[in-house]
Amino acid sequence: MGNAIREKTIHGIAASSGIAIAKAYRLETPDLAAEKRTVADVEAEIARLEAAVAKAKEELEAIKQHALEKLGEDKAAIFAAHLLVLDDPELLNPIKEKIQTERVNAEYALDETALFFISMFEAMDNEYMKERAADIRDVTKRVLAHLLGVTISNPSLISEEVVIIAEDLTPSDTAQLNRQYVKGFATDIGGRTSHSAIMARSLEIPAVVGTKTVTAEVKNGDIVIVDGLDGQVIINPSPELLAQYEQKRARYEAQKAEWAKLVHEATVTADGIHVELAANIGTPDDVKGALANGAEGIGLYRTEFLYMGRSELPTEDEQFVAYKTVLEQMNGKPVVVRTLDIGGDKELPYLQLPKEMNPFLGFRAIRLCLEMQDMFRTQLRALLRASVYGNLKIMFPMIATLDEFRQAKAILLEEKEALLRQGVAVADGIEVGMMVEIPAAAVMADQFAKEVDFFSIGTNDLIQYTMAADRMNERVAYLYQPYNPAILRLISHVIDAAHREGKWVGMCGEMAGDPIAIPILLALGLDEFSMSATSILPARAQLKKLAKEEAARIKETVLSLGTAEEVVSFVKRTFSLA
């Protein structure tokens, strides 16, 4: 009875699939309270600060190397960015000035300055900038610990099977997790796009984040179930519930084993129609995971990771090597590269772009590239040079008008002609397309379809722009509705317009891998589904059981419904989805 009384379920956000059952290990946040003291020797205090920064750099360098070996280049880039923070005079100079002018101790000056920057970034109210706040918090916590002589928990020392419970996991915490012992984790804060969630998916560790209260409810040694499928954390489950979850875990593992058999199969519907399943990637390191999960191509190569976590623009040759590597690894399979989508909410400090009131509607992506043409042309040259090494397709992000697309394509053709004049080989017939993520582009799809080779629908932005709802703002997140009939009608309009001109349509937003969305998108005629690598095999298994002709019959009904709830209910009933 004792267990039954103490059993408790907490709800959070399913951040990484799977089920973990193990003893709880609380990753405690050390007391880093920085009391204010007056110092007599200002120079000695600045020297203390610099010594602590140097030690923090040593640790981060070691963690970066560990991440590089275990997780790949893109995850290691997080720590390269942290090292840049510790070299940033905009952070360090105000700390030193505070020590000098106020004659205060280094701990207090660091803490106060960090809090100022953290609150400034958090007030910007978009996920990317909030993650910059998390970077500063992680880095300054490490320096502060050295100043205070406090030891920070090291998850790499765990030597028994556990589920980690923490307020949050910093990137450096997550990079040190050993999969042999850490079976899952649950945190109070965070979302699906936070560093810890991304790392968990990379490590394939079940995770639930954003529970708000898990650290208040769980003690060391409690038996905890982390349900990364449904976003639940069960504390001290009853023997009956524990047995149910053991079965649920076994079913999930068996299902994964069945999915694994589909790795080398093409995606063919029950009535014999081929549908392309592709992967979204950020770096060349991601190709390995894409192929291991049976990707038939790369539907979105986000090139901005090449530009982030560094102090200057990548050179043409650096970019060429990255693009060539991806194309060669994909061995003739299509690779759709999105040109630089940066600016506004995704900052590159070295570009020194002005702060904007509304970065999502501001100077970003193709708008920035058409103005900063030297940077844009460098990327296009690198892509064109790499094109001979595989099946390259190029697409431009955030296109709102025909003029933008025409201008971007004209620049691409100018660079191609210049390379050919120089005797540099460029592939023939490179397809050039665009992202459809702005409602204006979706509405005008019939005109764009005459000039593009393909469309890729970016649902993440298309939904928030159409619904006028920031998906990272909890107060309006209920309006972020992928199944809203307005969104489905736009998607249908884009696909129909493209098909009338003989062009193909892909989708690279999260919606493409959603089990409820898949039958709808098949019904609407989507040609290519591009998703995170781990979603490919479940999607393939689902599509093999669906008949395209049968799915097509629901198109009219789905588009005639009035609410997202009605759409979901209808699709679940029709296709027997849970």
UniProtKB/Swiss-Prot annotation:
- Mind listing the GO biological process terms from this record? phosphoenolpyruvate-dependent sugar phosphotransferase system
Which Cys-Cys disulfides exist here?
Answer: none
List positions binding phosphoenolpyruvate: R302, R338, N460, D461, R471
Q: Where in the cell is it found?
A: Cytoplasm
Cofactor requirement: Mg(2+)
Q: Which UniProt keywords apply?
A: Cytoplasm, Kinase, Magnesium, Metal-binding, Phosphotransferase system, Sugar transport, Transferase, Transport
Q: Which InterPro entries match?
A: PEP-util_enz_mobile_dom, PEP-utilizing_PTS_enzyme, PEP_util_AS, PEP_util_C, PEP_util_CS, Phosphohistidine_dom_sf, PTS_EI, PTS_EI-like
Q: Which residues bind Mg(2+)?
A: E437, D461
Molecular-function annotations in GO: kinase activity; metal ion binding; phosphoenolpyruvate-protein phosphotransferase activity
Query: Reaction(s) catalyzed by this protein?
Result: L-histidyl-[protein] + phosphoenolpyruvate = N(pros)-phospho-L-histidyl-[protein] + pyruvate
> What does UniProt give as GO cellular component?
cytoplasm
* EC identifiers of the protein: 2.7.3.9
A single Pfam family it belongs to is PEP-utilizers
Principal place where this protein is found? Answer: cytoplasm
Active-site residues annotated for this sequence: H195, C508
Q: What else is known?
A: The reaction takes place in three steps, mediated by a phosphocarrier histidine residue located on the surface of the central domain. The two first partial reactions are catalyzed at an active site located on the N-terminal domain, and the third partial reaction is catalyzed at an active site located on the C-terminal domain. For catalytic turnover, the central domain swivels from the concave surface of the N-terminal domain to that of the C-terminal domain.
Q: What is this protein for, i.e. what is its function?
A: General (non sugar-specific) component of the phosphoenolpyruvate-dependent sugar phosphotransferase system (sugar PTS). This major carbohydrate active-transport system catalyzes the phosphorylation of incoming sugar substrates concomitantly with their translocation across the cell membrane. Enzyme I transfers the phosphoryl group from phosphoenolpyruvate (PEP) to the phosphoryl carrier protein (HPr).
Subunit composition? Homodimer.
Q: Which family does it belong to?
A: Belongs to the PEP-utilizing enzyme family.
Q: Domain comment?
A: The N-terminal domain contains the HPr binding site, the central domain the pyrophosphate/phosphate carrier histidine, and the C-terminal domain the pyruvate binding site.
* Name the UniProt record assigns to this protein: Phosphoenolpyruvate-protein phosphotransferase
Organism of this sequence: Geobacillus stearothermophilus
